[in-house]
């Protein structure tokens, strides 16, 4: 390092502590980067890469950005997942001896950004900290530095389960200890696309102990300690806005895994990953940024406590029934800025005068809001606003201190109102009225002394002076005038008052700017005292905003208040999919009932593709979620139980689990439901088994249905294209067949989108292919083959069988084959006739000659005697393996 100049040595010394970050090194009016940082930053920021002499034989790569534009460049890097260490000059270069002292004043990371385009006003910007314990459990702590919110929870389960909970927080950065395994880190970076940071300290930092008073578990404290230590180490400034840590447990809320949230499009759509088109988009009628954030949090964690849900519903009903109250509240909420993030900026020291003006304007609305809510005859409303302080003294302070239209910078002056500070008023008066004041002083001195020729003048060397001719010197009072200069015919004097005013006049502008800055920083410290009250007020305002949002959308979309029941029954009359209905924009939406009494657990849904099976299933889930966050629901009548979990398998394979086939994802999600669902859960399975061969898929689908029916008892909607499964209604007493109806008109299918009792009688798959505009020749051939398969033609479909058997294997093997139609020589009896794919009996056709030998006929007879509905999938495969071996022995 000694080969480099002292400044480059200083750079390298600082950089050694921030190897994983870009180092913005302040040099005069620029932030410079050197070596690898410069090469990489020039590429990422698309700025010029140059070089400079650093003392070594080779020139050093260098790039830089102006300090006044650095914020934009820092945001670009952080948006891409990088960290930026800001290194400032911490002493005046004019007085520095040697190299100017520099220090890193802040490490800016994806999880610690306070403002900028990466921060969505209606979303939290969480930083997560994950701590792993020897017993296999984890503690997850989260902090939103912009709002001061802190949460912590204890997690158990597989690493995948833990990662999914981390993902659910929406964190952009996660802090772990240095002992985390490479495999775990790979999952965090590759699967969750999060920035990784390290912190080994877990003790609660000094001065923050009061934030964990309600946390007693050592594991939780360690996670919070890791989080706080990282924040302190990186931010290096006041954290007065941090709120007490909130403990939550996943079993306190309805559990909806990440796959299900995506499938249901709760907060973003599957295709675009955007809010528009999601349930959140529909329900968000909030007027404040903090209300928008709370709405999303409620949607991420629906309630499971019946009493709490009903409290919200009653409050929403109050707003629905009082239009004028609701509209007045909305008008006032429009004027309320983001109190949480304003409080955070105050604590961080980066609040400006416009921010404080926004704070005052917000507080002006609060008394009327609280008064209106206090008049409601509602216990929940009374409890909600209890302890809410409108901070009227702060409103008054800001009202008399901050100008109505202050500049953005706090170092340009013109921030503080006249009358707030006497000294500032004097400076301003002097600055604006210096000459007038001098003329007034001159007149006053003439009156005091009686010397009419007395005058006040100014020159660059002596400044301001009072000049008296020598003939009038005797008229001057003794002791008041100090001689400053002697001329041939006159003497020049100075008085204490003139000396003071001279200083004021000459330095007024400079002193005005500095004094305003000092007054503003002092004011900022006074505002800090109100941070806890502001944060409490923000929560009250946020909750009222979400509740009025529910009321507004409920009235606009004609939703109905759901009735919660302790019974395991669902009664939804004329239910609708809220988002689909909204997107249709006035076009006819076909509502559907969903009526499942206590003794009915499973709906087996059949019907054509594109007929609305998936929409119907999602509809029930969304109605459930809306009910349990406290919103009215899209129906004319709704009676619902409180569900503890929702499990779904709807739609295409989820890309969160990379490298897995559709079928494997299906099985993993089915396993999740089977392993974790209770009789209080809701299960939605759409076309389970389609990712494998027909018989495999059918066998697995049947086994899953039977297991849910017999072992779990959860309310379940199970759609299938295996029409053979509809016979399960005969053996499973709590299963009911329903179908989505369709009709044919002039050879074309018309989907009615109506759920009706019973099984479907036709698939209409070819009609769907026609809608997709497949070639006419292909459609015609498909109709030919379908006719042959349904036995409507005498042409035999050529048998295509691929059998792979490991003869030495002692256990049964899975045989994958195409369906081969087996024709018999005799006319089949009614009992022997084969069922077609969707219900009708296969017509038997007498063949000209037999296709089976004696042994094959015997095996076929045994197959016909087998009762598949009385066998498990494993037993069925064993029997198939036995018969297969019998055939091959010939």
Swiss-Prot record:
Keywords: ATP-binding, DNA damage, DNA repair, DNA-binding, Nucleotide-binding. The lineage of its organism: Bacteria, Bacillati, Bacillota, Bacilli, Bacillales. Belongs to the DNA mismatch repair MutS family. PROSITE patterns: DNA_MISMATCH_REPAIR_2 (PS00486). This protein is involved in the repair of mismatches in DNA. It is possible that it carries out the mismatch recognition step. This protein has a weak ATPase activity. One of its GO terms (biological process) is mismatch repair. One of its GO terms (molecular function) is damaged DNA binding. HAMAP family: MutS. Gene3D superfamilies: 1.10.1420.10, DNA repair protein MutS, domain I, MutS, connector domain, P-loop containing nucleotide triphosphate hydrolases. This is DNA mismatch repair protein MutS. GO terms for cellular component: cytosol. The keyword Nucleotide-binding applies. ATP binds at residues 607-614. It comes from the Bacteria. It comes from Bacillus cereus (strain B4264). Residues 832-851 are annotated as: Disordered. SUPFAM superfamilies: DNA repair protein MutS, domain I (SSF55271), DNA repair protein MutS, domain II (SSF53150), DNA repair protein MutS, domain III (SSF48334), P-loop containing nucleoside triphosphate hydrolases (SSF52540).
């Amino acid at each position: 390092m000694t080969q480099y100049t002292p400044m480059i040595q200083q750079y390298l010394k600082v950089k050694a502590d921030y190897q994983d970050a870009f180092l913005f090194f302040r040099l005069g009016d620029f932030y410079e980067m050197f070596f690898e940082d410069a090469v990489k930053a020039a590429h990422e920021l698309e700025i010029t890469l140059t070089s400079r002499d650093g003392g070594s034989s080779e020139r050093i790569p260098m790039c830089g950005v102006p300090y006044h534009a650095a914020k934009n460049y820092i945001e670009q890097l952080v948006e891409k997942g990088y960290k930026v260490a800001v290194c400032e000059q911490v002493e005046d270069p004019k007085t520095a001896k040697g190299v100017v002292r520099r220090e890193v004043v802040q490490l800016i990371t994806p999880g610690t950004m306070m403002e900028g385009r990466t921060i969505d006003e209606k979303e939290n910007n969480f930083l997560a900290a994950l701590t792993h314990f020897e017993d296999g459990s984890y503690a997850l702590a989260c902090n939103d530095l912009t709002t001061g919110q802190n949460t912590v929870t204890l997690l158990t389960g597989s690493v995948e389960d833990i990662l999914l909970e981390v993902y659910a927080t929406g964190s952009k950065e996660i802090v772990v200890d240095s002992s985390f395994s490479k495999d775990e880190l790979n999952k965090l970076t590759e699967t969750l696309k999060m920035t990784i940071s390290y912190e080994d300290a877990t003790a609660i930092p000094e001065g923050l102990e009061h934030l964990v008073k309600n946390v007693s578990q050592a594991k939780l404290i360690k996670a919070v300690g890791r989080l706080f230590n990282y924040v302190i180490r990186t931010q290096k400034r006041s954290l007065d806005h941090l709120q007490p840590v909130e403990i939550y447990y996943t079993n306190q809320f309805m559990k909806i895994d990440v796959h299900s949230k995506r499938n249901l499009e709760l907060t973003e759509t599957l295709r675009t990953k955007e809010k528009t088109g999601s349930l959140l988009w529909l329900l968000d009628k909030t007027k404040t940024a903090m209300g928008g954030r709370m709405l999303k949090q409620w949607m991420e964690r629906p309630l499971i406590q019946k009493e709490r849900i009903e409290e919200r519903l009653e409050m929403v009903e109050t707003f629905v029934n009082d239009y004028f109250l609701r509209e007045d509240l909305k008008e006032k909420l429009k004027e309320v800025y983001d109190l949480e993030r304003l409080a955070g900026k105050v604590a961080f020291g980066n609040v400006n005068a416009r921010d404080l003006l926004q704070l005052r304007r917000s507080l002006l609305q609060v008394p009327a809001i609280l008064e209106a809510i206090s008049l409601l005859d509602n216990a929940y409303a009374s409890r909600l606003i209890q302890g809410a302080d409108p901070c009227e003294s702060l409103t008054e302070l800001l009202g008399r201190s901050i100008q109505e239209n202050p500049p953005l910078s706090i170092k340009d002056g013109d921030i503080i109102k006249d009358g707030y500070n006497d000294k500032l008023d004097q400076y301003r008066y002097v600055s604006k009225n210096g000459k007038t004041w001098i003329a007034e002083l001159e007149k006053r001195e003439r009156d005091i002394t009686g010397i009419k020729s007395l005058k006040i003048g100014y020159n660059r060397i002596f400044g301001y002076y009072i000049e008296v001719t020598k003939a009038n010197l005797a008229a001057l009072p003794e002791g008041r005038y100090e001689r400053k200069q002697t001329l041939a015919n006159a003497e020049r004097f100075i008085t204490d008052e003139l000396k003071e005013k001279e200083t004021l006049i000459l330095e007024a502008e400079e002193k005005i700017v500095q004094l305003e800055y000092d007054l503003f920083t002092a004011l900022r410290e006074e505002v800090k005292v109100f941070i806890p009250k502001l944060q409490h007020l923000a929560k009250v305002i946020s909750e009222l905003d979400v509740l009025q949002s529910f009321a507004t959308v409920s009235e606009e979309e004609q939703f109905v208040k759901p009735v919660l029941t302790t019974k395991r029954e669902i009664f939804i009359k004329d239910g609708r999919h809220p988002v689909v209905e909204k997107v249709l924009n006035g076009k006819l939406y076909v509502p559907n009932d969903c009526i499942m009494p206590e003794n009915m657990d499973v709906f087996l849904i059949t019907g054509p593709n594109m007929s609305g099976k998936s929409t119907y299933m999602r509809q029930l889930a969304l109605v459930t979620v809306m009910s349990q966050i406290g919103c009215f629901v899209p129906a004319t009548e709704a009676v619902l139980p409180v569900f503890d979990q929702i499990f779904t398998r709807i739609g295409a394979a989820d890309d969160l689990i990379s490298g897995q086939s559709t079928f494997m994802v299906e099985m993993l999600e089915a396993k999740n439901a089977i392993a974790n669902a209770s009789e209080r859960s809701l299960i939605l399975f759409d076309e389970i088994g389609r990712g494998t061969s027909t018989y495999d898929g059918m066998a697995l689908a049947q086994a899953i249905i039977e297991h849910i029916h017999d072992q779990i008892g959860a309310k379940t909607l199970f759609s299938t294209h295996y029409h053979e499964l509809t016979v399960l209604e005969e053996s499973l007493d709590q299963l009911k067949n329903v179908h989505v109806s369709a009709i044919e008109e002039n050879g074309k299918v018309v989907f009615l989108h109506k759920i009706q009792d019973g099984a479907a009688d036709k698939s209409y798959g070819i009609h769907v292919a026609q809608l997709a505009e497949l070639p006419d020749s292909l459609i015609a051939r498909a109709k030919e083959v379908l006719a042959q398969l349904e036995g409507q033609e005498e042409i035999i479909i050529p048998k295509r069988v691929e059998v792979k058997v490991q003869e030495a294997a002692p256990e049964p093997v899975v045989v994958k084959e195409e369906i081969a139609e087996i024709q018999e020589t005799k006319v089949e009896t009614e009992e022997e006739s084969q069922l077609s794919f969707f219900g009708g009996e296969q017509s038997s056709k007498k063949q000209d000659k037999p296709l089976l030998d004696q042994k094959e006929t015997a095996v076929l007879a045994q197959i016909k005697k087998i009762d598949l509905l009385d066998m498990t999938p494993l037993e069925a495969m064993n029997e198939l393996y036995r018969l297969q071996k019998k055939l091959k022995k010939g």
